[in-house]
Amino acid sequence: SKKADSKHWVTSELFYDKDGNMYFAGVDSSAWCLYRMNLKTQEISEVFKLDNKSTRNYTKLAGYDGQYFYVFDKPDLSKGIKNITTDDKNIVYILDTNGEIKDTLEFNQESTKTTADVNILGGDRRYLLVTTTDTDIQQFKASSELMSKYEELKKRMETEGSSKLAQVCLSAVLDKADIGTGNKEWIQITPE
């Protein structure tokens, strides 16, 4: 525990709990950290530390729902898609307010086993919402009907010589009651 100082780089993601604590992400020379600051005493303590020596990863505090923190650690796509390998992981660490990992979510493409690009959008108290434009993710594959529509749109755009991209956005939710149980059932909510 230490008094607030400026040696840590702090992001703009601030979250508060019911006990008068503020949580924020920061980095030091070798790690991404989640910190807790008691707003009365200004004491700062480290809650969770993720070794981040690799320049290949991008780590973000994706959210806090009053019970869990969602820390998103994924390959840095700005380094170039060709540099991403099957060793690179796309993981969401689900932590309690003491920094204990309660569960992890990993997103990979089914055909190549490489990382899939997803967005963690929070959700509500009951569900965690995830979206993606990748159509080949193990956890929530696009339906055959949606894929047929997508392929038809891609063909039409190619034959018309359009410079626009045909994209599909898949959405799925995870019941937060499944966190920590080992039974993670994704519920597909993408409209057809």
Model-found features: residue ranges?
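Beta-propeller fold detector
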Residues: S1-K2, S45-D51, K102-N108, N183-P191
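Structural motif
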Residues: S30-Y35, L77-Y93, D136-R156, S163-L174
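Short loop/turn segments that connect beta-strands within beta-propeller blades
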Residues: N38-Q42, D96-E100
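Short loop/turn segments immediately following beta-strands, especially the blade-tip
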Residues: A177-I179
